[in-house]
Amino acid sequence: MSSVPQIKVPATYMRGGTSKGVFFKLDDLPEAAQVAGKARDQLLLRVIGSPDPYGKQIDGMGGATSSTSKTVILEKSAQSEHDVDYLFGQVSIDQPFVDWSGNCGNLTAAVGSFAISNGLVDAERIPENGICTVRIWQKNIQKTIIAHVPVTNGQVQETGDFELDGVTFPAAEVQIEFLDPADDGEEGGDMFPTGNVVDQLEVPEIGTFQATFINAGIPTIFLNAEDIGYQGTELQDHINGDNAALARFEKIRAYGAVQMGLIKDISEAAARQHTPKIAFVSQPKAYTSSSGKTVEAADVDLLVRALSMGKLHHAMMGTAAVAIGTAAAIPGTLVNLAAGGGEREAVRFGHPSGTLRVGAQAELIDGKWAVKKAIMSRSARVLMEGWVRVPGDTF
């Protein structure tokens, strides 16, 4: 049997928010992978260790969860008034595809840090000490994101005392602004794709549910927890070990995707695992988080649990947090009603790992709701930098 030597590609392994991923500069990729297509997808699949029928990603950099099966490609921005172009790829764990349909809000927190450290931000824009404002063009969703990255002695500051539920160790705070987060592109249409803040979602053999469909941060389907038999206090083990429940969620997600106009037939949902997300909400209740910490009902405005890539997320996807903050700011959505109704510019919600505060500024313009921006804080840190190796016949 002939052997094929491995090739090595410069890469950085980073945590951003409650996710981890492999970061690349576009011009560091092999030439065939510098353009979208089969070669790029095959490279990223092999880097992460997919597809893996065992579901472990042992032979790659992935961690066998939706939060750790991620890749990022960055380059100097081709857009005016922007520093860096950011492309995100969600790698399927057990299937041979990379989903490019949405953003990763958590890894967004690491984009600014990487861009500063890797020469993608003009040196004159980086303060010796203070906050560097990194202007990000998110290529998947065609939106602007602003990252406020702390800098000390001309270098990105990664350590600090900011605590983020779902991350064990404190780090430096990175504030993220998602400008005009509602999806007005070809696939999404208006913020509310049906024109309603609440719809009826009929799912054959499962039931009919109230649902809020929203395109903000990431396309998301919100349901009431009690309508689907939950309290809103559930942790991962309550749902991820129940294959029948996961199948029900996926069927609901598929029918919701059709109603949102994201796909034409439910059969297409299997190849679009990253979007839309599906989440369920409830009024505040006390619960014990996955770390053992008690979250009191008085600590939060509502509870939210969300699924990503077919599993209940261990904390909350950053883009889904944008959707939560946006929906909470708009009277009448299921998220807003779970939080007590009325107008608000910020909400603190409980998730499996603890709590998170997210703000959004909404206004009614010509009969349609618009959101100027959504804001939240995350943190980021370089875990490893060097080269990642893949067999030379990968692509």
Residue ranges of predicted features:
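A glycine-rich beta-to-alpha transition motif near the start of alpha/beta enzyme domains, typified by
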Residues: M1-F395
